[in-house]
UniProtKB/Swiss-Prot annotation:
GO terms for biological process: positive regulation of transport; protein folding. Disruption phenotype: Lethal. This is T-complex protein 1 subunit theta. GO terms for molecular function: ATP binding; ATP hydrolysis activity; ATP-dependent protein folding chaperone; protein folding chaperone; unfolded protein binding. It comes from Arabidopsis thaliana (Mouse-ear cress).
């Protein structure tokens, strides 16, 4: 009888043992909203130029000190399924534009927080979703009206125009150093910009991080910087043709074992000589083809190196196949699988290739000053690895912003001017609506206020005063009034030159709204019992006993 009374009931009777089932407003919807709010609370304090850094130590004990939201959420290993939706939205934003991940997460969190208030007032989630959907369409319409006139066309090779659009994205990561970084990134991007700018490839701008010095010691190399020394004694070549061998520079040996029967000392001597002659013949053929530099993707035999020295050929080893591909792009070479005589069209060319020492690190620099090469390297200098990693993220943001502006160069006012204008116009739109949608549209409009509030809070200013001043200015028709964080007052963005890309705002707004509506549409969560077996990594397994909940 006891066994009968303990049998599962309802949906549990249908599922396997260990399943968890959550349903209803309180258990599913509100819990999901709370998880998303927690995530947005983490990233929100990192928004804007005065944003705080987060110190994240991942499961491999790697330390991250950054205010880049995309990096933070990537390394947090979030388990909650609803919060994961926001992470996916941020990743989509990062891949599409390369900037605005924080805006996406924080805005989605704010939308959900306001939705929770409406749910507690008695509105049904479907009514909120309907209102939010209308608000998104209207917001996109308003955003297009706020585009700065004349920004539809730009010369992507004009340094000043590019920097004006890139400054805000880089300043949000490295405030105070944006001028140096923007200048470096712009030069690097313009060098490798193809004839059709929409085909710009972010992989063509590389970053090489070298410890020591400071950011002001950073420079740009038109070509590649390899963190390795040349093999052999030849360390420099000018105007050299390059032969690339992916499989290594060594005598080829068969995979099966060969046995040789030798009767006399002469035969032994001749056997060694034939091997030597074979290697010399191959190296001589490479030298006669005009190549002064050999780049190997594998091992370099001692005998081969000896003959390379004799024929005055510089030898480099690049173990990474990705680096080898980039080197081929830099030099315009075609990689051969094994050591053989290269044809003239397969040879690459570099203006100079030399081994240099920068800050105690030996690097090989391959330069190609003439046009036509497609790789540019930003050499970053800094005192610690964490600083260099963060500088690299700022450079990546700058390069991605350049790619975005090559496709769509339109700009909108930054410094929270766009958000306040959107909030104000959406509130007017909501007042004209009839039905329950108006409450959701009003809350959607209020959600935009988190941007000026967060920017002011992070800069230590009085948020309420700033927002009130912004609303007053925008109400009197000044659509470009934003926050000047340095002076702690409201100022026209035409003076402060803070512009954001239209595409960044548009995609952040769309992705955040989609993520928020997706979370609100969920009314039941059914979770299987986690599969047994080893954890995903040893670090988790070690701490599993302590973490088991």
């Amino acid at each position: 009888m006891v066994g009968m009374s303990m049998q599962p009931y309802g949906i549990q009777s249908m599922l396997k043992e260990g399943y968890r089932h959550l349903s209803g407003l309180d258990e599913a919807v509100i819990k999901n909203i709370e998880a998303c709010k927690e995530l947005s609370t983490i990233t929100r304090t990192s928004l804007g130029p005065n944003g705080m850094n987060k110190m994240v130590i991942n499961h491999l004990d790697k330390l991250f000190v950054t205010n880049d939201a995309a990096t933070i959420v990537n390394e947090l290993e979030i388990q909650h399924p609803a919060a994961k939706l926001l992470v996916l939205a941020a990743k989509a934003q990062q891949e599409e534009i390369g900037d605005g991940a924080n805006l996406t997460i924080s805005f989605a969190g704010e939308l959900l927080q306001n939705a929770e208030e409406l749910i507690r007032m008695g509105l049904h989630p479907s009514e909120i979703i309907s209102g939010y959907t209308k608000a998104v369409s209207k917001a996109v319409e308003i955003l297009e009206q706020l585009v700065e006139t004349g920004s539809e066309t730009m010369d992507v090779r004009n340094k000043d125009e590019v920097i004006s659009r890139m400054r805000a994205a880089v300043a949000s990561k490295q405030f105070g150093q944006e001028e140096i970084i923007c200048s470096l990134v712009t030069d690097a991007c313009i060098q490798v910009c193809p004839k059709n700018p929409t085909n710009f490839n972010v992989d063509n701008v590389r970053v090489s991080k070298l410890l020591g010095g400071g950011l002001h010691n950073s420079c740009i190399v038109r070509g590649m910087v390899l963190k390795s020394d040349a093999v052999g004694s030849i360390k420099r070549m000018e105007k050299a043709k390059v032969a690339v061998f992916a499989g290594g520079v060594d005598t080829t040996a068969t995979e099966t074992k060969g046995t040789v029967l030798i009767h006399s000392a002469e035969q032994l001597e001749n056997y060694a000589k034939t091997e030597e002659a074979k290697v010399e013949e191959l190296i001589k053929a490479v030298a006669e083809s005009g190549a002064k530099v050999i780049v190997s993707g594998g091992s370099i035999g001692e005998m081969a190196l000896h003959f390379c020295e004799r024929y005055k050929i510089m030898v480099l080893k690049i173990s990474s196949k990705f680096e080898l591909r980039r080197f081929c792009r830099t030099a315009g070479a075609v990689a051969h699988l094994k050591l053989s005589r290269p044809s003239p069209e397969d040879l690459g060319y570099v203006d100079s290739i030399s081994v240099e020492e920068i800050g105690g690190v030996t690097v090989t620099i391959a330069r190609n000053e003439e046009g036509g090469n497609s790789i540019s390297t930003v050499v970053l200098r800094g005192s610690t690895d964490s600083i260099l990693d963060d500088l690299e993220r700022a450079v990546d943001d700058g390069v991605n912003t350049y790619k975005a502006m090559c496709r769509d160069s339109r700009i909108v006012p930054g410094a929270a001017a766009t958000e306040i204008e959107l909030a104000q116009r959406l509130k007017e739109y909501a007042n004209a609506e009839i039905g329950l949608d108006k409450y959701a549209i009003t809350k959607y409009a209020e959600s935009f206020e988190f941007v000026p509030k967060t920017l002011a809070d992070n800069a230590g200013l009085n948020a309420m005063e700033i927002i009130a001043a912004l609303y007053t200015g925008h109400g009197s028709g000044n659509t470009k009034l934003g926050i000047d964080l340095e002076e702690g007052a409201c100022k026209d963005v035409s003076e402060t030159k803070v512009w954001d890309l239209f595409a960044t705002k548009l995609f952040a707004l769309k992705y955040a709204s989609d993520a928020a509506c997706t979370v609100l549409r969920v009314d039941q969560i059914i979770m299987a019992k986690p599969a047994g077996g080893p954890r995903r990594d040893a670090a988790q397994a070690a701490g599993a006993g302590a973490e088991e909940d």
